[in-house]
């Protein structure tokens, strides 16, 4: 509205340009001084005067709570929209909780926790797998099939030690298949059987005063090297020529 009134009430006049020479010769164009005449009064009010008289209308506050339902129903029929309830106030509504509401919420939370963690709610002990605890085999446990941590010392029973001694008496070295059979029969792990046989072989060598295989291999290598060196020295002495006598 402001833009249109500005265009109407402005004193700006669009300039007009003289036509071609042929129109000037015919006398259709007036004197050029007529183009710069004072603009005529168009009869419209200027900027200081309002275009329309201002009315005494006062805008009243709109109550959102008193919206008629009929208008919403008519609008919904035309545009397939469902009317929605309008809140009475823009602020949050604080309602007093009924008696036992907190208890109901707490029981609901407990039921959800019991569904997520059934073992904790029912008081059952958590499942502990064999690899989660240190095992010291003091009794024969047929149900145990797990391993043993590296730094734990195994206490063998008399029955286990006797069976291992019998096996060592016949075979000081075990194959993989036989080691698996012994471990399964005695409720031990393969590593336990392997370590027991290693310790038992070292003890047997000490009892029979047998040298260690590693020490014996190193000593044999050193003796062979020294023998080769002595042989080279002897061959060098044989190749040295004898000096000629001065008298001859």
Curated annotation (Swiss-Prot):
Keywords, sorted A to Z: Developmental protein, DNA-binding, Homeobox, Nucleus, Transcription, Transcription regulation
Domain of life: Eukaryota
GO molecular function, one term: DNA-binding transcription factor activity, RNA polymerase II-specific
UniProt subcellular location: Nucleus
Record keyword Signal present: no
Region (Disordered): 23-107, 207-248
Chain intervals with Low complexity compositional bias: 217-238
Pfam family, one: Homeodomain
Annotated region of DNA binding: 149-208
Job of this protein: Sequence-specific transcription factor which is part of a developmental regulatory system that provides cells with specific positional identities on the anterior-posterior axis.
Family: Belongs to the Antp homeobox family. Deformed subfamily.
The protein's name: Homeobox protein Hox-A4
Biological source species: Morone saxatilis (Striped bass)
């Amino acid at each position: 509205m402001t833009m249109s009134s500005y265009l109407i009430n402005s004193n700006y006049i669009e300039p007009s340009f003289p036509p071609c020479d042929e129109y000037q010769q015919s006398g259709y164009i007036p004197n050029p001084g007529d183009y710069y005449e004072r603009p005529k009064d168009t009869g419209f009010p200027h900027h200081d005067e309002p275009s329309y008289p201002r009315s005494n209308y006062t805008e009243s506050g709109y109550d959102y709570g008193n919206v008629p339902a009929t208008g919403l129903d008519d609008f919904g029929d035309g545009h397939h929209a469902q009317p929605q309830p309008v809140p009475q106030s823009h602020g949050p509504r604080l309602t007093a909780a009924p008696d036992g509401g907190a208890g109901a919420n707490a029981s609901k939370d407990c039921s959800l926790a019991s569904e997520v963690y059934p073992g904790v709610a029912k008081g059952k002990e958590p499942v502990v797998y064999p690899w989660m605890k240190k095992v010291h085999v003091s009794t024969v446990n047929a149900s145990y099939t797990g391993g043993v941590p590296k730094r734990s010392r195994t206490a063998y029973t008399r029955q286990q030690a006797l069976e291992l001694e019998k096996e060592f008496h016949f075979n000081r070295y075990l194959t993989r298949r036989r080691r698996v059979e012994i471990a399964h029969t005695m409720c031990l792990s393969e590593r336990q059987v392997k370590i027991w046989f290693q310790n038992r072989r070292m003890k047997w060598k000490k009892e029979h005063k047998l040298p260690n295989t590693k020490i014996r291999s190193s000593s044999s290598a050193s003796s062979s090297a020294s023998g080769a060196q002595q042989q080279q020295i002897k061959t060098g002495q044989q190749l040295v020529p004898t000096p000629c006598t001065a008298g001859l």
